[in-house]
Every structure is written in structure tokens, then in C-alpha cells.
Amino acid sequence: MAGRFGYEIGDYKFVPEEFLPATVCDKIVGARVSDPGLIRRIARARKRRPALTRDGKLTILSVDHPARMVTRVGDNPLAMGDRYELLARVSRVLTDSRFDGFMATADVVEELLILDYMVQRAGGPSFLGEKVILGCMNRGGLAGVSFEMDDTMTGYTARAINDMGLDGAKLMFRLEPGSCESGKTIMYCVNAINELVDL
């Protein structure tokens, strides 16, 4: 029997409600509205690693697909479009010590920071402490649209990554030989790298 997302691992089936209360999204929105400065304080206070990698390797969970309209998982075209399930699955994965961290756009990073803060306030352990967090920068190349290869910097800026105390940035470049838009994206990435280096 296929799960809601159209796949299962053996007999295992992830049930979000068994891991994370279904009311969590409302609480995250409430925290954003009632205390706009909370996210920055949480981010700046987060315990970071003394070194990026412990063994020369990194296992990073990618959570930036929905930002460019990629939401399909298995036979469900909108699986990653369900924010509650996305947060439940990502936070569950990040509790595993074999994962070093994640990459995401600002909306997801901020919601995970708030969720981690709420878990700690409730007496639980941090699932983001000493995890590597990478801010995704260019998500403007929306999947399937005419300007997909013109992948503009619609995510984090270099300054925002630095201000939030993130551990690094993620850029994506796809070479499409028949598209001059790829050439523009090369320069977007070069400029972003230079800005990051200058910080």
C-alpha cells in the first residue's frame, strides 16, 4: 500500500501528527506576528559548530525545492506544498545526528528556527544546535516557466545570510547550451560569491 506521498520504506510510514502537533503552523505564525524580532534573536543565539565539518564530509538536507515550484514527491504533485507536513518531515530528519544540516530559503529557515525555539521552551532538545544552515540565494528560475534558466537572486542576500548568522550560502547554476539566459545566471552567481567573500 502506497503512502500519502506515493512511497514507503519497507513497512515504515511517517505520520506527521505522531511527531509534531498539527497546530504548530498556527503557533509559528502567532510568534511571527506577536514578536517580529524573535527570529533574528533566535538565529543570532543559535549554537554553531566550531568547524563546518567534523569528518571532512557533509550530509545536507535540501529544502529549497518549493521555492522554485518543485513540489512533487512520488505520485503526489503537491506533496512539498503542504507546509505542515514539510516542517514535520524536515524537523524529524534533522533530529538524526547523521544529518549535518539543511539548505532552504528564508521562509523555511525562519519557521524551523521558531519551531526549534518552541521545542526548547517546552523542555525538549534543540534539533538545530550545531547544525549547518545554508541560505539559498537564487530561486527565481521557476520550474517550467519561460524564464526558468534566468535564475535570479530572489532568496537570501549575502548580507542577510551574514546578519542571520547562517553557516553559508547555496547557489544553483544549470548550463543550458541553447539558452543565453544561462549566461546571465553565471554572472548572478559570480557576483553573489564575490559579495559573500567580502563579508
At which residue positions do the language-model features occur?
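An N-cap/entry alpha-helix motif that binds or orients negatively charged groups
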Residues: 2-51, 67-117
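Short boundary motifs at domain starts and secondary-structure transition points
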Residues: 47-53, 123-126
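Short glycine-/small-residue-rich flexible loop motifs, especially phosphate/cofactor-binding loops
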Residues: 49, 158, 194
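Proline-centered loop/turn at the N-terminus of a beta-strand
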Residues: 58, 130-134, 199
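Conserved, mostly hydrophobic/aromatic
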Residues: 61
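Active-site beta->alpha loop and helix N-cap motifs at the rims of alpha/beta catalytic domains
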Residues: 65-68, 77-190
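A contiguous, surface-oriented mixed alpha/beta subdomain in the mid-to-C-terminal portion of proteins
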Residues: 180-181, 195-199
